[in-house]
Each structure stands twice: as structure tokens, then as C-alpha cells.
Amino acid sequence: MADKKGSSSEKLLYCSFCGKSQHEVKKLIAGPSVFICDECIDLCNEIIRDEASATDKDATAATRSDLPTPHEIRESLDQYVIGQDQAKKILAVAVYNHYKRLKHLGKKDDVELSKSNILLIGPTGSGKTLLAQTLARLLNVPFVIADATTLTEAGYVGEDVENIIQKLLQNCNYEVEKAQRGIVYIDEIDKISRKSDNPSITRDVSGEGVQQALLKLIEGTMASVPPQGGRKHPNQDFLQVDTTNILFICGGAFDGLEKVIMQRSDKTGIGFAAQVQSKEEREVSEVLPQTEPEDLIKFGLIPELIGRLPVVATLAKLDEAALMQILIEPKNALVKQYQKLLAMEGVELEIRPAALSAIARKAIRRKTGARGLRSILEQSLMDVMYDLPNYKGVQKVVIDENTITGDAAPLLVYEEQQPKVAGSN
């Protein structure tokens, strides 16, 4: 380093960048045959700061454009899931806030944003799993479905809760970074409810014990996962997966929860202002949106787990009109799928409105919701799909109400010929 003062006999040194002599600046730093003054260093630092700031702004703008807004998330859900408008809105906001939080994790800030996991409550076949699957596909993140009924505490026969993270890793080719931003959907969460309000002296390895094990996973922990799906043994190197930023969505039918809610509301609704309404008159779909944490505790979930699932969305039971829409409107609607299957044989499929209504009514009677629609349609088309490759000249297959009820076979329309019934010679 060359100081400002120097003897006249010494050779005068100059900054290699601005050309100022050592007498014109405070400091002159020497490198291998190169010199730089303090003023040029300050200027370089200023340029670097400005460029870094511009890069951060561009990254923030890119983040906003990459992440779909709640309205866009809702519109995407509408393409695949019919009805459940309030649940879609709640999910869209929760998922948007979660991934917006992840985008800003690296920034230093006084306010630390906590994770908001989601609890979906609704009857079988109302769209809980489909909503979670559609969200993961939209956001292009790893996704896994786990069945809570197969889980047990560590050390007991059954699946360990850490197996969920192992499956998530498998779905993204063991890329830990990707897995740590994925979505885990835990189905049948209501089936691991505590068997009674009072703690039992016997070990509940598939109830409260599993809830306690899930608690750490959902809250955020370092899960040890064997590489490439191997079994755990002491002398093995494990993959460490941080679950802090994994979004957990838990779903369940919670059969009987409406009774717990009605008992609570009956106690609070006393006096002249109380609305007199019999339990039979109150639909489950009307009661479930009134769910409070105390109801879930009474049902059998532990308070700590409920606290880790702050976003609660309830799904309504699907009526006949909604089930008919599900058959024909979504992008991957069942009718469209079977029309495509028959189109591969060069045959058109027509399902009349009366048949759609009959399918919906049958699903409601079976209490299977949207999940039961496929089996009803498959059963009605089974004989046609079996015989169709052997038939020649079939132009169209027509399904009417009598086909669904089993009173008549599907109608086959031949090219320039009179219609015939399937299976007749």
C-alpha cells in the first residue's frame, strides 16, 4: 500500500483506473503491477450495490409472475373441481400465502412468517383429494398422498410417519430441495382420533400416538430418510429432509362431527332469541362450516395437532345437479374420458341427460359421492366395451336412463342401418 506522503526521490505511483497520483488520493493499494485508489474502490462498491439492488427487484418481480394469484389458483381449481366455492377460496389464499412466504425466506426481516397448514372436512367423494392433487399439479411441486389409517408409532408394526417423506422424495427422484417445498396430503385424518376424551392406560399406537408423531412432522423437523427407499439400519447414512416448509393438507370425512357441533350450539342457543330447529332439519352441510377447535378436540384430535392446522375448509355434500356437472364439465370429466375410449374404436358415445341424472341419483343412494360415479358408468358400459372390438359398422353407442337402472342394454347405431340393442344378434 502506498501512502500519500513520499520522498521526492521515490518513483511517483498512479491509480491504474482513474490515473490519479498517490499524492491526489488518500490511499493507493498495490497489486501485481496494478494500483487502485480508495476513490475507485468506493465507486466499485457503489456500482455493485446498485446492480445487486436491481437484481433483487427483478427477482421479486419474477417471483410475483411465477406464483399464480389466488384468483388464478381458484380459476384452475374450477376447471377440475365442481362446486365447493368457499373451500376453493380458502385453499387459494392459504396456498398463495404459503409459497409467497417461501419465496421471501432468504430475506432478513423482523417479522417471521409461520406456516399455515390446512384441514379439509367433508363427506366421502366431495373433492378433498382432488383439490389437493390439482393444487400440486398447478404449482408444479412434488406431491404425495398418505393414508393416516396405515400409520403407527415408531417401533410398532405398520408404517412410520417418516415413510410419508420417503414417498415424497421418491416422487421427485430424491431431490431434497424439491421435496422440502412439496405438498403432503394426509387422508383419513379423522380415523386416528383419540378413542376417548380421557387418556387411557393402554397404548393407542394408531390413534393419539400417531397424532403425536405427525405433530413434529407437520410443525417442522429434520426427518431421517434411508437413501433410495432402503430400510433403516444403524450403520447407514440417511438423507436429512427439513419438513418446516412442506405444506401439509389433512383431510377427513369426520362422520359424527355434526352431532358434536349441534350439541355445542344447542347449549349456547338458549332463550327467546334461539332458533328452534330440529336436528333432522339441519343438513350436515349447514352444520360443518360452524366447526370450532373445541369440536375437533371433542371428536378426538389432540389440541396440539389442531393448533398446527390453522386453516380449516369445509366441503359440502354434492347434490344431484353437482354430480351431473362433474360427469360432463371438468377438463377430465368422466363422460369425456369414456367418449375418448370409444372414439379410439371409431365409435361415438352419447349419454342422454336422463342417464346422467340416473347415475347421479345412484351415487347419492350409495353415499359414495363423486368417487362412485366411475364404477356406475363402467358397469353400464362393460358389455359394450367387451363386444365392441368384434362389431363392425357401429357408428354410435347411446346410453339412456334404462341402461343405468339395468332395465335395458345400450343402444347401438350402425352406419345407414336401424338401431340395435347391444348383445342382440
From Swiss-Prot:
Q: Which residues bind Zn(2+)?
A: 15, 18, 37, 40
Cellular component (GO) terms are: HslUV protease complex
UniProt xrefs under Pfam families = AAA_2, ClpB_D2-small, zf-C4_ClpX
Keywords associated with the record: ATP-binding, Chaperone, Metal-binding, Nucleotide-binding, Zinc
Any one Gene Ontology MF annotation carried by this entry is: zinc ion binding
Q: Which GO biological process entries does UniProt record here?
A: cell division; proteolysis involved in protein catabolic process
Q: Which InterPro entries match?
A: AAA+_ATPase, ATP-dep_Clp_protease_ClpX, ATPase_AAA_core, Clp_ATPase_C, Clp_protease_ATP-bd_su_ClpX, ClpX_bact, P-loop_NTPase, Znf_CppX_C4
Against SMART domains, the record matches this protein to:
AAA, ClpB_D2-small, zf-C4_ClpX
Q: Which SUPFAM superfamilies match?
A: Glucocorticoid receptor-like (DNA-binding domain), P-loop containing nucleoside triphosphate hydrolases
Which residue range or ranges hold the ClpX-type ZB domain?
A: 3-56
- Binding locations of ATP: 123-130
Q: How does it assemble?
A: Component of the ClpX-ClpP complex. Forms a hexameric ring that, in the presence of ATP, binds to fourteen ClpP subunits assembled into a disk-like structure with a central cavity, resembling the structure of eukaryotic proteasomes.
UniProt lists the family membership as follows: Belongs to the ClpX chaperone family.
Q: What does this protein do?
A: ATP-dependent specificity component of the Clp protease. It directs the protease to specific substrates. Can perform chaperone functions in the absence of ClpP.
Q: What is this protein called?
A: ATP-dependent Clp protease ATP-binding subunit ClpX
Organism listed in the record? Cupriavidus metallidurans (strain ATCC 43123 / DSM 2839 / NBRC 102507 / CH34)
